[in-house]
């Protein structure tokens, strides 16, 4: 009797030990994966390039440094955008993670008269004093590529002028004489342009010749183009 019980205990112990070893091995593997994942994730975030200077923010956004400090990444402005233009940046986007931005070439700001994104912001990162969408300053449109713009080739394209929400004020065609003759060149009035991106969205070229850039950068590019220098954003 005693011998049988001893054999049973020995048999049970023999079965339990491999199970415990398997559980320990699985636990060790999971911990290892978690540690490696954490290290890899941290390294990935550290290796991310600095946020691009070409990111476009919602209407009423404060200056970029102040905006990043005030924005709590709540996503309320994104939720309240009726056209789903705004999105929150992921780690792969050219903006700090969780901050709202839009890509004009994909979808421009529709310039809602009631500016719901501004009203939704709880912190003032989108300035509540902005009540007239025509006073928004999301950026400025710049003709960044004279070589591909159809008007510089002597053709008559006026798409960017015709689709502009502030038609006849923010962008117009100005006559310029060159070896090809009298050209009608898209010209942006930076004091009237809101940076909505409608012109960039509707440019008929595969890569838009006109782009919307944050105002400081855009004015620098415009000045470089006028002086015949290489645009600073390229």
Swiss-Prot record:
Disulfide partners: none
Keywords from the UniProt entry: 4Fe-4S, Electron transport, Iron, Iron-sulfur, Metal-binding, Repeat, Transport
UniProt-annotated binding residues for [4Fe-4S] cluster 3: 149, 157, 160, 164
Residues that, per the record, bind [4Fe-4S] cluster 2: 109, 112, 117, 121
InterPro entries: 4Fe4S_Fe-S-bd, 4Fe4S_Fe_S_CS, MauM_NapG
GO molecular function: 4 iron, 4 sulfur cluster binding; metal ion binding
Binding-site residues, [4Fe-4S] cluster 4: 193, 196, 199, 203
Residue sites binding [4Fe-4S] cluster 1 per the record: 71, 74, 77, 81
Alphabetized CDD domains for the sequence: DMSOR_beta_like
Annotated ranges, domain 4Fe-4S ferredoxin-type: 61-91, 98-131, 140-176, 184-215
Superkingdom field: Bacteria
Pathway entry: One-carbon metabolism; methylamine degradation
Record-linked Gene3D superfamilies: 3.30.70.20
NCBIfam families hit by this protein: mauM_napG (TIGR00397), PRK09476.1 (NF007012)
Function of the protein: Involved in electron transfer.
Designated name of the protein: Methylamine utilization ferredoxin-type protein MauM
Organism the protein comes from: Methylobacillus flagellatus (strain ATCC 51484 / DSM 6875 / VKM B-1610 / KT)
